[in-house]
Amino acid sequence: MTTLVGLVGWRGMVGSVLMDRMTAERDFDLIEPLFFSTSNAGGAAPAQAKNEKTLQNAYDIEQLKRCDIIITAQGGDYTTEVFPKLRAAGWNGHWIDAASTLRMKDDAVIILDPVNRPVIDKALAAGGNNWIGGNCTVSCMLMGVGALYKAGLVEWMSTQTYQAASGGGAQHMRELLTQYGTLNAEVKALLDDPKSAILEIDRKVIAKQRSLTEAETANFGVPLGGSLIPWIDKDLGNGQSREEWKGMAETNKIL
């Protein structure tokens, strides 16, 4: 019997890359995919679908329970709402998640198999079924130095990173690109005039940035187009951003 694998969040930033990768590596040949949607239940499933041609409601616990494995890139809010309900309903399948929500739970394993494959194998043999993707900075960092840690050659390390806006997800990316379009439209006439003063263009761009509405900055909370912000997650109130905390806590858990 073919393994029934539910996919949630497959249209977002992370999910789109995953779909491309699974298609290129012919992973869909090995499974029966069941596609879920939080906004378009009843719509047509993508081309990778086989027998399950209709999008299912991603909040329908009974439909989710059909799956042997669920892969979700829908984000932390979805995991927070659905995962406990699904487990409480008696589902014991494998939950594979890109979000950070479950990473530090005792019954979850952060997946970075080139570094912690023995941990993964041990958890699988013991009946583990919560497999969580790690923070991107942590994963890239440990891929580079994991072997040095295993050899006992590293006492401590420090890492610095710029977070990409895409780390917030597809809606954050849409907001950023829309802001760029808004700023361009504000000064397009001046840009088209080779005699226009660059300082006047600069002033108009800044003024437009500062006047963006709450709706235009709903995801990031502030104008990001043409600017920088300290983080895209949150301030923990102790001098650390959540991203910095992940760099320490997740690294130690993986190791």
What positions do the PLM features span?
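Oxyanion-binding "anion nests"
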Residues: 208-255
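N-terminal Rossmann-like NAD(P) cofactor-binding subdomain of oxidoreductases
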Residues: 1-218
